[in-house]
Structure formats: structure tokens, C-alpha cells
A protein has these predicted regions:
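Hydrophobic/aromatic beta-strand patches that form the interior of the parallel beta-sheet core
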Residues: 42-44, 72-74, 118, 177, ...
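Structural recognition of the conserved hydrophobic beta-strand(s) that form the central parallel beta-sheet
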Residues: 73, 142-143, 174-181
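Cofactor-binding loop segments of dinucleotide-utilizing enzymes, especially the Rossmann-like FAD-
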Residues: 76, 181, 228
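Alpha-helical scaffold elements adjacent to nucleotide-binding pockets in ATP/GTP-utilizing enzyme cores
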Residues: 82-90, 161-164, 215-219, 242
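Conserved catalytic network of the ASCE P-loop NTPase/AAA+ motor domain
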Residues: 35-36, 65-67, 107-110, 131-136, ...
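Conserved inter-motif catalytic segment of the P-loop NTP-binding fold
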Residues: 67-160, 291-292, 299-305, 314
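The Walker A/P-loop phosphate-binding site
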Residues: 1-93, 314
Length: 314
């Protein structure tokens, strides 16, 4: 099908007049580099055991509570209960052991309005995961990790999947994040810091270290690298976010500079802090806080959050 001539005029005029809508942020420094946008295919890269999934869960939780986005998650290496345990702890801002049974059950019911999980007891083909995403009706999908799928392990096979995933987001409007691992070369001696305070520690993988080749980076919209110095006595509590690709900077986001990642402080496991800002803080439940909506009925904070969650940010 050929597109009509002139059908891009309104977009061009909006660009000229500064009316292009920005991607969704978290109201912290991370927004300068990373924005959520609909209809995108995004890649996440990082070494094993640096906390990629943990950071992704925090990021998704914050987007859900702030913007009402809904997520469909396939996590081949983590159980649903483990993910929800971490999310509830972040949401409450308290360690899980300090929560009552009633708090846990209430928070579970609330958060499951935003998060749907795909059964990981089955080995899925890529097209089966995409079908589950569509069935969920969610705004966002996560494949974690790509290497856990029943797939053709070849460069051509990776391109075929990325092309199908690209067509899926274009037609469906969903945004998909794909969590990936780097190749073996990225973990060898040549990728260690050679001097200074970080001597001997493993560097973050380069964009082109992604296992399976450049088919992923060539076909994705945005790409970020998650890294952590897991053996450093101080830096092991800091997660680095390096934004390596932003396809459309007009709608927000930009590359992080070399050696200047966005630093996310672990914050004792109750939700990351970035430059002293805890993006989850405004959305944590406060049983004493009540609000009066326009119709004069009393509305608890939790009810207000549920109401806001049903509003479409786009």
C-alpha cells in the first residue's frame, strides 16, 4: 500500500512548532537520557548477575504507578513470586519481612492490575511469545532473556525475529523490551579496567558485544546497557545505566557520555535513588492520607492510584 502525499504535514508542522509529545519519564535525572515511548522495540544488554532484571522491575513498576502502563512479562530465569516480592518491597519502601499479611495481600492485588506474567514452565518460540503479548492487551512486553527462547541460533534467525518483532510493534502499538547477554569476549581480560580505583574490575559490555551480533542493535529503536561492579566494596551498590542508542531524540532521550553513566543507588533494596531522588516516593501508600475528589466523596490514596492507573497517558 502506498502512503498518501501530504499525510505527514501535520507532523512536520508540530515539529516546527515544538508540539511533539515527549516520551514518559520518572521525574528524575534519568529522564534526560531515557524515555518510555509507545510502539518501540528496545534492547537491554548486560553481564550476568549485575541485576538487570531487578533494575527492569523497578523501572517498570515506576512507569506503572506514575503513568498507568500495563506490562506483560516473560521471565525465563525468575519466578513470578520473586519478581512481585521485590516489587512489593519497592512499592512499600519497607523490607518484605516488616510487612503484614494484609499489606502483602492488598499490595499484590493492586500491583497485579498492572502486571501480567507468562508461564515460564514452557519453552516458547518467539512467535508464541508475541502471541501471548497480543493476548494480554498490555501496553508493554518484556522478553527476559532472549536466549531463553526456543529459537534459531543464527545471525539470520536473529534478523528474522527482529523483523517480526518490528512488524508486531508497528501494527499493535505495543512497546517490547528484550533483555540480552553479551558474548564471551566481553568477559575476558581485555575488558577489565587496567588501572586506577577500578583496576581488575569488569567493564560494561560495548553495544557491539551483544550475543548474536548487530542484528539486534541495527533493528532496535533504543538500547541501554545495565552494569554493576559486583565485587567492588562500594560500587556494588550502584547500578550504571548507559544509553547507547536513541532512535528519535525529538521525543526525548539522548546517549549517555562515555564514562558518565546514570548512577542508580541501591537504597537498601527499597527502590533506586538517582541523584538523591526516589521516583517511587510519591506513589507509596500512606494509610493516613486522604483526598477529596470533585464529587465530594472521600477517596483513599490507594483508590486514587487505581483511578489514575486507568487513565491512558497517550
Amino acid at each position: 500500500m502506498l502512503l498518501k502525499q501530504g499525510d505527514s504535514l501535520q507532523y512536520l508542522l508540530d515539529v516546527r512548532d515544538g508540539k511533539i509529545k515527549q516520551g514518559l519519564g520518572l521525574d528524575c535525572f534519568l529522564d534526560e537520557h531515557l524515555r518510555f515511548k509507545p510502539k518501540q522495540l528496545n534492547i537491554i544488554l548486560g553481564h550476568d548477575n549485575v541485576g538487570k532484571t531487578y533494575w527492569i522491575n523497578w523501572y517498570f513498576l515506576t512507569l506503572a504507578l506514575k503513568h498507568g502502563l500495563t506490562f506483560c512479562i516473560w521471565s525465563g530465569e525468575n519466578q513470578k513470586g520473586q519478581i512481585l516480592r521485590d516489587m512489593i518491597q519497592m512499592y512499600r519502601g519497607k523490607h518484605f519481612s516488616k510487612l503484614s499479611h494484609n499489606q502483602i495481600s492488598g499490595d499484590l492485588a493492586y500491583l497485579e492490575q498492572f502486571f501480567t506474567f507468562i508461564d515460564n514452565s514452557k519453552l516458547y518460540k518467539p512467535e508464541e511469545i508475541l502471541a501471548q503479548f497480543e493476548k494480554s492487551g498490555c501496553k508493554v512486553g518484556l522478553i527476559d532473556p532472549f536466549t531463553g527462547l526456543d529459537r534459531e541460533m543464527s545471525f539470520a534467525g536473529n534478523y528474522e525475529f527482529m523483523n517480526k518483532a518490528r512488524q508486531f510493534v508497528n501494527q499493535n502499538g505495543m512497546t517490547i523490551y528484550i533483555n540480552t547477554h553479551p558474548n564471551s569476549e566481553s568477559g575476558r581480560g581485555g575488558n577489565l579496567y587496567a588501572e586506577g580505583e577500578l583496576k581488575g574490575h569488569l567493564k560494561a559490555p560495548l553495544k557491539d558485544h551483544i550475543e548474536g551480533g548487530k542484528s539486534f542493535t541495527n533493528r532496535c529503536d533504543d538500547m541501554l546497557v545495565i552494569h554493576r561492579l559486583i565485587k567492588h566494596p562500594e560500587h556494588k551498590y550502584k547500578t550504571w545505566i548507559q544509553v547507547e542508542k536513541v532512535k528519535d531524540m525529538e521525543t526525548g532521550g539522548k546517549h549517555t557520555e562515555m564514562d558518565f553513566p546514570v548512577i542508580c543507588e541501591f537504597n537498601s533494596g527499597i527502590g533506586f535513588q538517582i541523584n538523591g531522588v526516589d521516583p517511587l516516593a510519591p506513589f507509596r501508600p500512606n494509610e493516613k492520607q486522604m483526598t477529596i475528589p470533585k464529587d465530594g466523596q472521600i477517596e483513599s490514596t490507594s483508590d486514587k492510584l487505581r483511578r489514575l492507573a486507568n487513565q491512558n497517558p497517550f
